[in-house]
Amino acid sequence: MAYGPWNQEQIDAAREVAFPILLGHLGAYYKLDPHFQPLDVSRCSQRVQVAYQGRDFRFIFTGRKFVNELLPADALQRGGGGAIDFVRHLTGYNFVQAVKVCLDALADAADAS
C-alpha cells in the first residue's frame, strides 16, 4: 500500500530518524536533562527539554517511543512511536507533511556527513 508519493521502505526510513536530527532540522532548541533517572535503566530513556515556535515541551524518549510529560497523563495523543508521530506531535503537521520533514532531515544529515 502506498502512502503519498513514498514507498514503504521510504516511510520506514522516515520513522527511524533520530530526534536530534529532526529537532535540528526544524530549528528547535533542545537539551538533555542531565538529572533525569529513568525507572528502568536498561531501557535507556532520556528526558529532553524542547522549545519550538514559542512552545515548550518535555519529552521522555525510549527508543522510538516518546511521551510529552507536560500533557496530562490521560490526554489523548500524549505520545507516540517513531519520527513521523513525533513530527506530527511537535508541529501539528499531517502524515504526508511529517514524512516529508523526516525524509528532508535525513537527507540533510547525510549531506552534512
Regions found by a protein language model. Give the residues of each.
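N-terminal structured subdomain of primase-like DNA metabolism proteins
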Residues: 1-113
